[in-house]
């Protein structure tokens, strides 16, 4: 049992108290404790504040959700139910801000964006004119 002091509050942990992770406190799915450990062991700085891993986890979770949403839309446009690297590439390259953020990133098995120079495409106006002249010659 825990002892009580002058204030009447129990000192120490009570039987009903439960450990709550920093991710749960922040309302995040990404692991704040693991990111904190990576920041400490990575020697990015001599000291790491308590808010830094929470903020970084929130940013990473937001970016992951954004890419997954756009990739899901790309998969749905292609009538697929599974997201593959091609859908992730299409999602990133078709979004202006994500494309700028990941400009030098290569996605394995992503392929390339479909792009044909308009000059190489056959022009429709020439075909219709030539057909019209041929019928008048006869």
Swiss-Prot record:
The modification N-acetylserine is found at residue 2. A motif ([ST]-Q motif) lies at residues 135-136. One of its GO terms (cellular component) is nucleus. This is Histone H2AX. Monoubiquitination of Lys-124 gives a specific tag for epigenetic transcriptional repression. Coiled coil: none annotated. Belongs to the histone H2A family. Core component of nucleosome. Nucleosomes wrap and compact DNA into chromatin, limiting DNA accessibility to the cellular machineries which require DNA as a template. Histones thereby play a central role in transcription regulation, DNA repair, DNA replication and chromosomal stability. DNA accessibility is regulated via a complex set of post-translational modifications of histones, also called histone code, and nucleosome remodeling. It is found in: Nucleus; Chromosome. It holds the Pfam family Histone_H2A_C. There is a cross-link at residue 124 (Glycyl lysine isopeptide (Lys-Gly) (interchain with G-Cter in ubiquitin)). PANTHER family: HISTONE H2A (PTHR23430). CDD domains: HFD_H2A (cd00074). The [ST]-Q motif constitutes a recognition sequence for kinases from the PI3/PI4-kinase family. The modification N6-acetyllysine is found at residues 6, 9, 11, 13, 18. Residues 1-23 are annotated as: Disordered. GO terms for molecular function: DNA binding; protein heterodimerization activity; structural constituent of chromatin. Keywords: Acetylation, Chromosome, DNA-binding, Isopeptide bond, Nucleosome core, Nucleus, Phosphoprotein, Ubl conjugation. The modification Phosphoserine is found at residues 123, 125, 130, 135. The nucleosome is a histone octamer containing two molecules each of H2A, H2B, H3 and H4 assembled in one H3-H4 heterotetramer and two H2A-H2B heterodimers. The octamer wraps approximately 147 bp of DNA. Its main location: nucleus.
């Amino acid at each position: 049992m825990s002892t009580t002091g002058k204030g009447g509050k129990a000192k120490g942990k009570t039987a009903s108290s439960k450990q709550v992770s920093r991710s749960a406190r922040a309302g995040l799915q990404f692991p704040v404790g693991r990111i904190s450990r990576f920041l400490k062991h990575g020697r990015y700085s001599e000291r790491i504040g308590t808010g830094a891993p929470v903020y970084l986890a929130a940013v990473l979770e937001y970016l992951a959700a954004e890419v997954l949403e756009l990739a899901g839309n790309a998969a749905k446009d292609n009538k697929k139910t599974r997201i593959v690297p091609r859908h992730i590439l299409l999602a990133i390259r078709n979004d202006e801000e994500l494309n700028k953020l990941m400009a030098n990133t290569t996605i394995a098995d992503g392929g390339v964006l479909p792009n044909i120079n308009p000059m190489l495409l056959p022009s429709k106006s020439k075909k219709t004119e030539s057909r019209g002249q041929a019928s008048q010659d006869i």
